[in-house]
Structure formats: structure tokens, C-alpha cells
């Protein structure tokens, strides 16, 4: 594999990964070899791979979390300010150690983590991120808060190298161009001692030809519960309110409890994004996609709430309107959204993987169509009740916890599609 990498790229630097192996040495290795501390195993394994890299003339780096969690037995960030690493298992001094953090809003946490890393290695690298992995929509408030805190700490402790990650969890649903504000922020902070909002906006326009403020409007797609505050909890309602089944209403309780007017919220956002689209012809399809998504959510987000309310009240007139007018309108909007997402994918990437996005979006259309059939049967008296709408709507999220669910298979049904064996 490493020979193939060396032949495929001009750089001699390679990232070996090796992160989040939380049960290292506690499975098959334990059964066959007996117990060895995880910290010893990660050191021995990384040393072996490092020797291969040296023979090939490659300069490797790895994620750092296993050198922390395997030594402490705790979480990656769960370290005391005065942590002493003198008796820890440590990597080879020439192996780059990458501290990844795009979660913490406070600079002091980054400073603590950097101090620990500098005890472990002389080649510490920082990896932050531009949040495009949280569902369908980017989270710029989280990106900006964490990046500013993280890079300020890197400057204070004179880290020579940083990079920006852009993960694609659960199917790369967010279009790749949404990464741009986070990337430009990284560059901006690399050339400015302090954050300068006006200079950043000018630099963003210089390198993209677009308005930063227009891009930042996309943050509102997942800020439904934030009341104007930054979405630091990484709530992602634009994903689960789109994908959830209208008859099951798994997330409806959270709309009801807060008495949110989701139709007005998302329609106002759609109107703003239509204006943004006119400002940014170079990113017309991106803004057309998010305009269409917001329009879809204006109809879809509280559909289950309206269905349940009308059903419980035996309001056949409202159910008739939902069946014959509301749902067809949502299907029409979502069909446009799906086609725009396909266009963006084929413009940005190879086709492989789009089938997953297509299945997800098309699945919503299929379930909306099935919902119409079920309603029609009930309205016409061919069935006496709809068992899906008989069930009480229960909270999905515990009180005081983030309203975030990024796994599609958990959103679409209470019956888990994943194999439990």
C-alpha cells in the first residue's frame, strides 16, 4: 500500500491514520497472545510501519489520540492541566503526531492539549476542521468558533504546521464547496495575527468571487433551535426533519415542545437564499440546491405534527388538504432538490457514492407517496384507523442534550436496518 501511495503522489509525506482504536489488543489479539497494554501495542505497531516508511523515503504522521487514550484509559480531551507524560509510551521522535480538534470552543482546552502533545513529540501538527460532515448542511458557527480558538492556541505555542479537515460522515451529503468559508478562515488566520472580519470577507471574495455573508446564510439550515445563537451543539435538524418518516414522526415532539413555526422559518430562509443565489453566479447550483432544500423543509419539517393533530381531531378536511395539496407540493420541491444534488455531485466528484444520496432522497419521496395512499384509504373509509398515527410521539433526544442525529438508518425508522450480530 505504501509503495502504491509513493508512486501515486509527488509528496513524500504520508498520513498513516491509526486513530480511534479504542479496543486495541482486547479482541482477537488478546485471545491469541494474551494481554498487552494498548499503549505498548500502538507504539510497537507504529514503529513497524514507520520503519517501512523510512525504507521508502516517506515522512509519516499519525493521529495522536491513541497515544493519549491508550496511556490514560480515558477520553482524548479528558486530561488535567498539569498532566505529566514522562512515564507514557511515546512515538518515535521523527513520527509526526497530529492533534485533531474541531469540537472545543475554548482556547484553554487547545492550549492544554498542545502542552501534552509537546511532551510526547517534537513534531506536533494541529488538525482543525470546516464542518461539512454534520448532515446535509454546513455548520459555520461551530467552524469559526473552534478554528479561532484552536489556531490562537497554535500561535501561542508556536506550532509550525496546521491543516483543515473536511470529513464526509454518513455519505458526503453536504456539497464540497460548502467547505470554502472554513478553508479561507484557516488561510486568513495564517496570515493575520488576529481575526479581522472585514479583511476575511474581502479575502473570501478575492479567492472565490462570492460573498462570505451569502455563504454564512447556510448556517441557518441547522440553527432552528438556536434562537439566533451559534450552533455549538451541532444540532442538525435539516437532516432528520427531511429524512424522518411523516407517519412515524420520530422527531416531531421536539418541534411541538418548542412551538416552532418551521414553515415560516424555512420559507424565510428560502427567500434569503434566493437573493444570495443572484449574488453568486459562480455558485448558482449550490445556492439553488440549498434554496430548494429550505423550500422543501418549509413544507416537510412539521408535516408529521400537522398529520397527527388533524388525525387526533378527526379533521378529515385538513387530512384531505394534506393528502392532495401539501404532500404533492413537498414531493415536487424535493424532486427538484434531488436533481440539484445530483448535478452538484457529478460536477464535483466521480459518480461512485452518489447512489447512497439518491437512495436517501428518493426514499423520502417514496414514503411521502405511501403516506398519501394511507391517508386516502383512511379518508375514504377503507380503513378505520392509521396505526402509525395512533401512537404517541415521544422525545428522541434527552433533555439538555444536543439535538443531533447524523446516522440515516436511525432517522428513518425505529426498526434498525443494521445487522446487530
Residue locations for each model-derived region?
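Short acidic/His/Gly/Ser-rich catalytic and metal-binding motifs that mark active-site loops
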Residues: 22-28
Amino acid at each position: 500500500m505504501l509503495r502504491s501511495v509513493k508512486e501515486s503522489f509527488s509528496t513524500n509525506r504520508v498520513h498513516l491514520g491509526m486513530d480511534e482504536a479504542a479496543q486495541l489488543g482486547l479482541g482477537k489479539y488478546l485471545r491469541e497472545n494474551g494481554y498487552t497494554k494498548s499503549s505498548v501495542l500502538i507504539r510497537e505497531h507504529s514503529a513497524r510501519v514507520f520503519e517501512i516508511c523510512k525504507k521508502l523515503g516517506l515522512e509519516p504522521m499519525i493521529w495522536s489520540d491513541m497515544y493519549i487514550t491508550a496511556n490514560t484509559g480515558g477520553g482524548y480531551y479528558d486530561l488535567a492541566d498539569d498532566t505529566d507524560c514522562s512515564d507514557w509510551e511515546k512515538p518515535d521522535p521523527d513520527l509526526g503526531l497530529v492533534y485533531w480538534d474541531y469540537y472545543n470552543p475554548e482556547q484553554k482546552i487547545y492550549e492544554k492539549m498542545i502542552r501534552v502533545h509537546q511532551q510526547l513529540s517534537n513534531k506536533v501538527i494541529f488538525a482543525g476542521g470546516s464542518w461539512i460532515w454534520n448532515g446535509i448542511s454546513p455548520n459555520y458557527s461551530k467552524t469559526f468558533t473552534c478554528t479561532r480558538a484552536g489556531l490562537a492556541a497554535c500561535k501561542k505555542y508556536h506550532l509550525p504546521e496546521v491543516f483543515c479537515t473536511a470529513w464526509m460522515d454518513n455519505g458526503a451529503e453536504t456539497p464540497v464547496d460548502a467547505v470554502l468559508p472554513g478553508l479561507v478562515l484557516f488561510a486568513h488566520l495564517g496570515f493575520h495575527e488576529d481575526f479581522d472580519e472585514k479583511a476575511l470577507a474581502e479575502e473570501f471574495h478575492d479567492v472565490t468571487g462570492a460573498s462570505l455573508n451569502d455563504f454564512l446564510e447556510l448556517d441557518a439550515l441547522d440553527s432552528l433551535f438556536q434562537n439566533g445563537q451559534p450552533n455549538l451543539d451541532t444540532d442538525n435538524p435539516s437532516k432528520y426533519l427531511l429524512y424522518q418518516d411523516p407517519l412515524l414522526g420520530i422527531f416531531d415532539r421536539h418541534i411541538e415542545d418548542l412551538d416552532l413555526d418551521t414553515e415560516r422559518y424555512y420559507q424565510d430562509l428560502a427567500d434569503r437564499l434566493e437573493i444570495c443565489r443572484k449574488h453568486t453566479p459562480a455558485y448558482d447550483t449550490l445556492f439553488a440546491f440549498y434554496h430548494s432544500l429550505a423550500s422543501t423543509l418549509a413544507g416537510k419539517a412539521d408535516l408529521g405534527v400537522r398529520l397527527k393533530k388533524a388525525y387526533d381531531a378527526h379533521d378529515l378536511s385538513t387530512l384531505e388538504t394534506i393528502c392532495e395539496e401539501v404532500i404533492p407540493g413537498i414531493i415536487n420541491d424535493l424532486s427538484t432538490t434531488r436533481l440539484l444534488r445530483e448535478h452538484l455531485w457529478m460536477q464535483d466528484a466521480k459518480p461512485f457514492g452518489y447512489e447512497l444520496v439518491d437512495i436517501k432522497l428518493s426514499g423520502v419521496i417514496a414514503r411521502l407517496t405511501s403516506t398519501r395512499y394511507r391517508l386516502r384509504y383512511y379518508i375514504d373509509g377503507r380503513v378505520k384507523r392509521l396505526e402509525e398515527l395512533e401512537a404517541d410521539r415521544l422525545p428522541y433526544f434527552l433533555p439538555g442534550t444536543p439535538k443531533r442525529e447524523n446516522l440515516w438508518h436511525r432517522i428513518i425508522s425505529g426498526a434498525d436496518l443494521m445487522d446487530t450480530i
